[in-house]
Amino acid sequence: MAISNKQKAAIAAIVLVGGVATGGVLLSGRSAPEEQGGHSESKGHGDTEHHGKQAAEADHKDDKSHGDGEHHEVKKGPNGGALFSRDGYDVEIGTAESKGEARIRLWVSKSGKAVANGVAATGQLVRATGESQALKFVVSGDALESQQPVAEPHVFDVTANVTLPGSSSPLAVRLSKEEGKIELTADQLAKTGVVVQTAGSAKVQAGVQFPGEIRFNEDKTAHVVPRLAGVVESVPANIGQQVKKGQVLAVIASTGLSDQRSELLAAQKRLDLARVTYDREKKLWEQKISADEDYLSARNALQEAQISVQNAQQKLTAIGASNSSTALNRYELRAPFAGMIVEKHISLGEAVADNANVFTLSDLSSVWAEFVVSAKDVERVRIGEKASINSASSDVKADGTVSYVGSLLGEQTRTAKARVTLTNPQMAWRPGLFVTVDVFGADVEVPVAVKTEAVQDVNGESVVFVAVQGGFVPQPVKVGRTNGKVIEIVEGLKPGARYAAANSFVLKAELGKSSAEHGH
């Protein structure tokens, strides 16, 4: 049957419309699965690994698997760690307490069931200070746990390579922590006055520190005794009084002194008589009137009388009594040297013995800082070495030298006594005051040292605040020798690390506030 031109045109229109509709159906059918499945990563994610980041953790880059430049957020696992997935396995990395210490832990699961056997992992922890720590993982229960504990502060990045069962290549997982970081802007840093310096080598004196106590200088301390028994008539001196040499401390009525003065007076009278007799006999002997025997006898008597007077005088001098007095029994007890009366055991009307300790007098212009040296430190403390004395209850400081080190160790304590002699013109060092004695040796070059004021005590641990991007991190350190200005860092800090050298106490206060707010 012949088809007219109108019929041909109608058929062509129908075919065209049907083709367009079919193409639309095909196009819509191709895009629907992609919309339902999210995004295809057959080329960009050949390993089907899922990457991302938690809001509190640092960004990570995965250029190889993210060939399209996409960025994904890390999923949070059921244990609060970062969750990664591949080949049906879920790997969560985080921290957990074990045996009282924090450790890095890996939780591996497949289809919701924990998998530990057949999984191996190694890793590396890098701190904000640049220090790195290799990590080895062992199976612990239904997870893998680092053999090495992780010390505070928990500000670090961890990368671990996890080998899964049946996998040809390890899965890289990452964890970032910023617990305890003190965040400060440049303006805040300027307002707080915190000064940042670089840790490096310095010269410090090899020294050792001892607890000590200020004591009387025993070379200038005396127990004053009367040396004659008697009754106290007056006591013009008082405890705490500064006295001069020869000043009267007490007056005692002594019968013994009366006898000695009487003996002197009698000896002087006998001497006068012997001198007159000798002069007369000498003249007669010169005139050939007196015999030689009489002259020699008179001269001998004179010499004996002189000896008796000298003996009586020296007895009085030995007890500190004057040769003459208005009262023969009056004994004036005088200060043997200038000093302060620190003890007094005498009162008016009291009968005292000749050996009674009635006063203790000490010249406090010089005192001793005594300390005890253990057997292991005896070789480090030598006579003549420089020492620094610091009061435990005030800001008083003084420098001196070691004046004595005991040559014998105590039988029970196994320690030796040592002391530093200090001048005390202002009487700032009082006997009984507890002090700290730092004994210094020769200068020693140490690889890492910081300012002494940079070291803060946080929960009984020495800490230096290290400058990191955006703030500071409290870094535990082990300190060594110090000269009072700089202190050696034995562990915990590397040369070149930037730290808070001045006003670090501000950071300590901020750390305390943060701990109180977060309960950490």
From Swiss-Prot:
Gene3D superfamilies, per database record: 2.40.30.170, 2.40.420.20, 2.40.50.100, Helix hairpin bin (1.10.287.470)
Family affiliation: Belongs to the membrane fusion protein (MFP) (TC 8.A.1) family.
Its biological purpose: CzcA and CzcB together would act in zinc efflux nearly as effectively as the complete czc efflux system (CzcABC). The CzcB protein is thought to funnel zinc cations to the CzcA transport protein.
Keywords (A to Z) from UniProt: Cadmium resistance, Cobalt, Plasmid, Transport, Zinc
Gene name tied to this protein: czcB
Protein name in the entry: Cation efflux system protein CzcB
Molecular function via GO: metal ion transmembrane transporter activity; transition metal ion binding
InterPro entries for the chain: Co/Zn/Cd_resistance_CzcB-like (IPR005695), CusB-like_dom_1 (IPR043602), CusB_D23 (IPR032317), MFP_Cation_Efflux (IPR051909), RND_pump_MFP (IPR006143)
Top-level lineage group: Bacteria
